Structure formats: structure tokens, C-alpha cells
């Protein structure tokens, strides 16, 4: 069964589905891996290998079945995308799968991931899909799913989608035809709702007039919305990488490459700069001297503000295992609590719901504040950081100097292309021995974290220590072991 798209007399895109013997041919050439498809942020990989049009088509059909069976009420699916060259193709294919299952699709085009999450929660939609690989390079892409509450699919629902997909492909069975085809609508006007809530999340007595702010938009999903909302609040905005560009998204720019932002902030005499990733669900900042302000600092500043306003239950912040020990100790010295989770904003979100925490996030810049939404939002976080600086009457650099001294922390990545070897790295005995040696040597003055990336073919090695020399030594030792036995 193959679904084609066509426009009717009203210009709406509808689907036509017919049986064919060729369904799944592309997937037969690129079989699904034995390891789980869903990582820490949906399905992600290199386009043309794991991700292709055939997989997106089948995935859309299977996701439609699961969502229709589990969401409280039927409704449309909202689809947004970033600027990658492959995003149009994957959007079209997954739309065909959804509409062939009888689900209506609202396509909103280029937008940040948090926009899809917000609209899934605040319209009659039964879910949302974002086509993006976040901070990954241009040749990658990904598919993120949200439920009707704007939350990423639970592990249970994601597993149901994956199980149905595997059964469909492995049995090479034909899908049962829907009694009626779903329709497709272009609903870009919905983005205005998201823009309005961004502006309304800032206190009405705060404006950014007189502040000069540099925005690194990473050639990605934030290029239209971020400048618009900062300007609407009175800021003087200087934009870098401010056009959608599928060839250059995240390339030497954005939240993973801050050099150009640091230079621009100093060159233009800006108060601060912020850098988004390709889908704008995370943000990092730099102060007027070009010093990096990561997610730990943002959590600390925002936590202080909410604590002073009595809006932070139990003075609790949820962070991940990557959070710096210097941040944790400083927050505890203020009477705060910090709970760590595994890496991934989905884990942070789950712990926030479980504990009733209102603030959580990651060092990498995914920040969630339940006072303003249920998902990490880079643009919203950047707005609040700028507002906090304005309200404080001090510079961002002064706030950093008065906060905490981070422990020396070194993070290195080793590329491991073999998916099964990467996912089963804990079975590597020499690496486990090396980790134990490093941790024993540093004792309670440092820590080691080794993990497989949930979004890229990497083994990540992090060593943190009071002593920079010790951190450097053990990082190099562990990297050598990973390269020898896994790479």
C-alpha cells in the first residue's frame, strides 16, 4: 500500500492510497536495527540510512493507530519542521502515513519544537510531530512525537509505536485501509498563538528597551520567531545565521559552537548573546565579555528568582548527572535541593512531575519551567534570562561572578559507528575497569560519567574534579580505552 498526495480544488492536500507489492522495499534494503529505534529524543539518524521516506510513511501510519487508540479524544496531528533539506521529504512522507490512517494533519511549517508542543497542548489536536534532529549536523534528521498534553510520548507509548512498526515491516503485511482518508491543512496562522504566549510569559512591568542582544539562530527553526519576540519587547537585536539554510544548520554556529557569538557580542558591545540549536528547544548564553553561561547558571539564576517569589516548592531544582558539582553545592548553600536524573529532558520532565518541582533542566540548555509550559523552550528561556538581567540592575557577567565557581569539567566524545557496540558499551570489561580506577583515584573530589549518546553515534566521556590536572589525566586515559575497545 503506497500513499500519494494531491491537491483538491480548494488547494488542500489530500491522500490517495492503493495496494502495491512494493511497500517497504526501501526498508528491506535498510532493515531496522535490533537496538531500540526511540532514543532520548525520538527517532534520529542519518537520512538515507535509518531514516528514509518509506520508514516515515510506515511510522506515520503506525503512530496514528497508537494515538487514536490511546488519546482521550480523536483530533488532528500538528506537524512542524526545521530547515534541513530532508525535512520537507520526511514531513510529506509521515503526513501520507497519518492521512492514510484517517488522521487529519495540520502542517505549520518552519517553527521551533516548543511551538509544536505548545499547540498540541492548547488546541484540539491529539498530538504533535516535529521533524528535526535538534543540534545534530545537516545530514541527520529526526522525528519527535508529542501527546495531547504537549509532552513527549511516554516510553510505553513509544514502545507501542515501535512494536507495531516492527511487526508491520517484518511480516511485510499490508495495512488495513481506513474507511476515510484524513485531510491535510496548512495552518501556519497557529504560530501566532505561540508568539503571544512567549510575550505574555514575561512580567508586564519588564521590558528589554535599551538592551542590545545578539541572537545566533543557527540557520534553523528560530530564524523568524526569536527576533520578532525580542524586538516586540523593546530589545535592540543583532542576528547571526538568520536565514533557514538546510546545508548550514548547526554548522559552526548555534548552541554547540559559540565562538562566533562570543566575537559578535564583544564586537557590537552587546549586553549579552544567546545561541539556539537547530530546533530552538535549547539555548546557551554569553555575557558581555564573551564568557559562556550554560544551563547550570540559568537554572541557578531562575531558581533564585522563583525562590525569592515563593514559587519554587521545597526550593527544588531537577537537573541531570551532567550538572556541575559547583552548581549543586552552591544551590545547597542557599537552602536549595537538587535531584539528578539521567541525561535527556524527558527524564527531567518525568522527575518534575513525580516530585512537583517547577524548575528543571540540563547543562546543555534544555530548561523547563512549569510556570510557563511543559517543555523545554530555548526562546522562552532566553527571554526570561534577559528579563532577569534587566530586573537585577546588574550585568549578566556580574551575576555569574556572584553565583558559583564550577568544578573543572571535561567532556569528550568518541565516534562509535557500530550501533550495537555503542548501545552495549557497559559490557566492555576493560572500560568498566578503567572507570572504577578513575573514580577510586578521585574519591569524593571528582566523578566520572560515561554514556552512549541518545541522539548521535557517540560515546561521551565526562570527568569532573576539583583538580584540573586530575580531570585531564583521567579523561585522556578513558578516551584511549574507548577508542581501543569500542571505536
From Swiss-Prot:
Protein task: Catalyzes the conversion of glucosamine-6-phosphate to glucosamine-1-phosphate.
Annotated positions of the Phosphoserine modification: 134
UniProt cofactor(s): Mg(2+)
InterPro entries the UniProt entry points to: A-D-PHexomutase_a/b/a-I, A-D-PHexomutase_a/b/a-I/II/III, A-D-PHexomutase_a/b/a-II, A-D-PHexomutase_a/b/a-III, A-D-PHexomutase_C, A-D-PHexomutase_C_sf, A-D-PHexomutase_CS, Alpha-D-phosphohexomutase_SF
Cofactor mode of binding and number, as noted: Binds 1 Mg(2+) ion per subunit.
Family listed: Belongs to the phosphohexose mutase family.
Active site: 134
Binding residues for Mg(2+): 134, 277, 279, 281
One BP term from GO: peptidoglycan biosynthetic process
Listed EC numbers: 5.4.2.10
Reaction(s) the record says it catalyses: alpha-D-glucosamine 1-phosphate = D-glucosamine 6-phosphate
GO function term, MF aspect, one: magnesium ion binding
Keyword Oxidoreductase: no
GO cellular component, one term: cytosol
PTM comment text: Activated by phosphorylation.
Keywords: Isomerase, Magnesium, Metal-binding, Phosphoprotein
Alphabetical list of Pfam families matching this protein: PGM_PMM_I (PF02878), PGM_PMM_II (PF02879), PGM_PMM_III (PF02880), PGM_PMM_IV (PF00408)
Name of protein: Phosphoglucosamine mutase
Residue ranges of the TM segments: none
Tagged with keyword Manganese: no
Amino acid at each position: 500500500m503506497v500513499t500519494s498526495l494531491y491537491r483538491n480544488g480548494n488547494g488542500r492536500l489530500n491522500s490517495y492510497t492503493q495496494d502495491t507489492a512494493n511497500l517497504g522495499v526501501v526498508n528491506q534494503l535498510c532493515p531496522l536495527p535490533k537496538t531500540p529505534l526511540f532514543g532520548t529524543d525520538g527517532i534520529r539518524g542519518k537520512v538515507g540510512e535509518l531514516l528514509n521516506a518509506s520508514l516515515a510513511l510506515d511510522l506515520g501510519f503506525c503512530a496514528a493507530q497508537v494515538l487514536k487508540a490511546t488519546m482521550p479524544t480523536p483530533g488532528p496531528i500538528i506537524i512542524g519542521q526545521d530547515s534541513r533539506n530532508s525535512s520537507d521529504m520526511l514531513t510529506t512522507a509521515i503526513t501520507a502515513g497519518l492521512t492514510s490512517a484517517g488522521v487529519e494533519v495540520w502542517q505549520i511549517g518552519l517553527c521551533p519544537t516548543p511551538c509544536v508542543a505548545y499547540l498540541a497542548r492548547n488546541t484540539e489536536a491529539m498530538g504533535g510531530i516535529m521533524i528535526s534532529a535538534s543540534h545534530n549536523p545537516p545530514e541527520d534528521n529526526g522525528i519527535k512525537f508529542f501527546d495531547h498534553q504537549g509532552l513527549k510520548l511516554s516510553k510505553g507509548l513509544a514502545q507501542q509505536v515501535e512494536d507495531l512498526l516492527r511487526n508491520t515491516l517484518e511480516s511485510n503485511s499490508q495495512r488495513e485501509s481506513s474507511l476515510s482518508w484524513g485531510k491535510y491543512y496548512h495552518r501556519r496562522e497557529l504560530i501566532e498563538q505561540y508568539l503571544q504566549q512567549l510575550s505574555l510569559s514575561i512580567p508586564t512591568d519588564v521590558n528589554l528597551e535599551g538592551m542590545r542582544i545578539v541572537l545566533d539562530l543557527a540557520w534553523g527553526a528560530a530564524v523568524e520567531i526569536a527576533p520578532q519576540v525580542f524586538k516586540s519587547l523593546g530589545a535592540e537585536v543583532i542576528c547571526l545565521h538568520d536565514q533557514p539554510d538546510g546545508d548550514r544548520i548547526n554548522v559552526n554556529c548555534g548552541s554547540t559552537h559559540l565562538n562566533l557569538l562570543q566575537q559578535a557580542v564583544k564586537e557590537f558591545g552587546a549586553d549579552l548573546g544567546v545561541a539556539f540549536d537547530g530546533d530552538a528547544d535549547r539555548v546557551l548564553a554569553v555575557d558581555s565579555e564573551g564568557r559562556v553561561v550554560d544551563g547550570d547558571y540559568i537554572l541557578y539564576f531562575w531558581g533564585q528568582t522563583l525562590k525569592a517569589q515563593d514559587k519554587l516548592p521545597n526550593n527544588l531544582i531537577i537537573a541531570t548527572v551532567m550538572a556541575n558539582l559547583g552548581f549543586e553545592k552552591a544551590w545547597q548553600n542557599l537552602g536549595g535541593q537538587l535531584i539528578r536524573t539521567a541525561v535527556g529532558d524527558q527524564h527531567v520532565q518525568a522527575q518534575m512531575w513525580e516530585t512537583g518541582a517547577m524548575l528543571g533542566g540540563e547543562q546543555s540548555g534544555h530548561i523547563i519551567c512549569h510556570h510557563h509550559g511543559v517543555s523545554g523552550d530555548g526562546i522562552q528561556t532566553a527571554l526570561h534570562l534577559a528579563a532577569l538581567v534587566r530586573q537585577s540592575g546588574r550585568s549578566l557577567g556580574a551575576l555569574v561572578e556572584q553565583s558559583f565557581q564550577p568544578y573543572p569539567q571535561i567532556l569528550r566524545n568518541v565516534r562509535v559507528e557500530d550501533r550495537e557496540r555503542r548501545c552495549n558499551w557497559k559490557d566492555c570489561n576493560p572500560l568498566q575497569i578503567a572507570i572504577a580506577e578513575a573514580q577510586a583515584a578521585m574519591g569524593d573530589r571528582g566523578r566520572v560519567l560515561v554514556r552512549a549518546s541518545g541522539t548521535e553515534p557517540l560515546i561521551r566521556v565526562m570527568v569532573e574534579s576539583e583538580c584540573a590536572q586530575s580531570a585531564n589525566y583521567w579523561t585522556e586515559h578513558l578516551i584511549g580505552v574507548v577508542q581501543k575497545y569500542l571505536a
